[in-house]
């Protein structure tokens, strides 16, 4: 079991100073975690969030320089609706790529027949399969192998492997300028060249277990979750520096992060609390908490932008949260139980794909009502599968967050 950290106070000012010093070479060993002690820094706690934060710009009309223009200011996912495939991906065969973290393999599934087409070896402990910002490459994050393995989505074949430290997760800045390797074990966000994957800057974070994140509507800031200390941390994307920190309640284990279509709030899955936090996108403030189920883990936006699908890994269910009402409106239970973890949605929006982390299987569910369409055996420890291709102009990373 991963170690939980009790209530921590963080000297954020020290971290900000450290974060300002860029590191131009690749680090060879683990960085020391930020100093822990009594702090008067802007660390806020859920329910008492009063400290200020460099505003993420949720309502800003100016996007991050170089970021593609938002086609609909009221819907950050407007370009990812059904059928809106980029010309880059239109010729790619529809596939589901499943990283098996305990077998060091990737399974390639046919989403029409629900059959496995191929299996190939990658590095040690693959965690997620991530589309590149330009949509041309899929990257497998080999966490313990300290490497990324490329997949050509035009052929479904394995490509080159490049050395990268501790790639638990992978994201891309909205302007495509940097790849962000989420180095959970090393407690930092590493900013890389998105093509060569050469390290450009390491940013230590003032919390433990950083593993998921999402970006504001204007692309100027990101919100990352820290599972082991129960924190959320804000980062200025252009400056690559920490700007704020929020402590959730005791026992919180925040996981996946997803921006609402209107860009006003973030939803944060909390495995420890069995639900989803609603976080103000403009300041470090908790707006609410929605109980969904044991082990709330992955978050996925429906193609029509009406619902947020929440995978409850501990009880084998999926909850639907209405973006309009910010309430849970339905719960689907996997027949016979399961351990739904990470995944994605088909290009037409009709099927929700999730891995069964502790059951060695993949679930395909009809989004029209939650009916289980298929239960597909895969390798051991399947984790962040990627459904590909998907609609959208560019990828922010993870298992396929496109805008």
Please give the residue ranges for each predicted region.
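Sec-dependent bacterial lipoprotein signal peptides
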Residues: 1-18
